[in-house]
């Protein structure tokens, strides 16, 4: 019975996915993923990216966000991206494949960033979802805490942090933590984000000294 339920749920997800207008637009435009449209909407409202910036992209695969940011920061900019999954190369993106939770991978990522601070840290990381909020939310909160830790390590004063968060236990505390570190914090729910999804995007700008 459980397998039948999973099969029906998977079929519904696939049907919803391929009928999604943003998935269809991404395919037509040759984009890596529908996430490109989420970031485009955030950029239109919050202007996070400018030419010449250095950006860290966590949870980068398949590359929708990196693909978008390249168009905003130009040839003088730089993107350092990381994901546990493989990602096809993108010109202008320095990609590291590995588990961000692993100390050796984190060390390698920090080495790629180097001594200079970055202007934006963005995270689209998410755990493998079980469908059970009591399991999924804590896993997600662990990842977003790691992303915030990366901000503390590499983000320049005045820099910005963009992170996908799933609303649930720990969300309010996490939001308070971000507000203590940044001068302006907004919550965005892009049109390309499915309405039934718990995901929202926290946009934090003006990292405090």
From Swiss-Prot:
Residue positions of the active site: 164
Keywords associated with the record: Cytoplasm, Methyltransferase, rRNA processing, S-adenosyl-L-methionine, Transferase
Top-level lineage group: Bacteria
InterPro entries, per database record: RNA_methyltr_RlmE, RNA_MeTrfase_FtsJ_dom, rRNA-MeTfrase_E, rRNA_MeTrfase_gammaproteobac, SAM-dependent_MTases_sf
Keyword Cell membrane: no
Location(s) in or outside the cell: Cytoplasm
Gene3D superfamilies xrefs: Vaccinia Virus protein VP39 (3.40.50.150)
Residues at which S-adenosyl-L-methionine binds: 63, 65, 83, 99, 124
One of the record's GO molecular function terms: rRNA (uridine-2'-O-)-methyltransferase activity
SUPFAM superfamilies named in the record: S-adenosyl-L-methionine-dependent methyltransferases (SSF53335)
EC class: transferase
Chief location of this protein within or outside the cell: cytoplasm
Catalytic activity: uridine(2552) in 23S rRNA + S-adenosyl-L-methionine = 2'-O-methyluridine(2552) in 23S rRNA + S-adenosyl-L-homocysteine + H(+)
E.C. no: 2.1.1.166
Stored Pfam families: FtsJ
GO cellular component terms attached to this protein's record: cytoplasm
Function of the protein: Specifically methylates the uridine in position 2552 of 23S rRNA at the 2'-O position of the ribose in the fully assembled 50S ribosomal subunit.
Family: Belongs to the class I-like SAM-binding methyltransferase superfamily. RNA methyltransferase RlmE family.
Name this polypeptide is given: Ribosomal RNA large subunit methyltransferase E
Organism: Serratia proteamaculans (strain 568)
Gene that produces this protein: rlmE
């Amino acid at each position: 019975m459980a397998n039948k339920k999973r099969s029906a749920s998977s079929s519904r997800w696939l049907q919803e996915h391929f009928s999604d207008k943003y998935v269809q637009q991404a395919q037509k435009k040759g984009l890596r993923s529908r996430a490109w449209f989420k970031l485009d909407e955030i950029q239109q409202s919050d202007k996070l990216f400018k030419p010449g910036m250095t950006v860290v992209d966590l949870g980068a695969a398949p590359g929708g966000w990196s693909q978008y940011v390249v168009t905003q920061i130009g040839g003088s900019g730089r993107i350092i991206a990381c994901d546990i999954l493989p990602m096809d190369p993108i010109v202008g993106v320095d990609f590291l494949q590995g588990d961000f939770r692993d100390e050796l991978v984190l060390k390698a990522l920090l080495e790629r960033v180097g001594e200079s601070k970055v202007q934006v840290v963005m995270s689209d990381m998410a755990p493998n979802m079980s469908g059970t909020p009591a399991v999924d939310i804590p896993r997600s909160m662990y990842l977003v805490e790691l992303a915030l830790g990366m901000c503390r390590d590499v983000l320049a004063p005045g820099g910005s942090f963009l992170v996908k968060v799933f609303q649930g236990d720990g969300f309010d505390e996490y939001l308070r933590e971000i507000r203590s570190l940044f001068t302006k914090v907004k919550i965005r729910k892009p049109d390309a984000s499915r309405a039934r999804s718990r995901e929202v995007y926290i946009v934090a700008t003006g990292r405090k000294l």
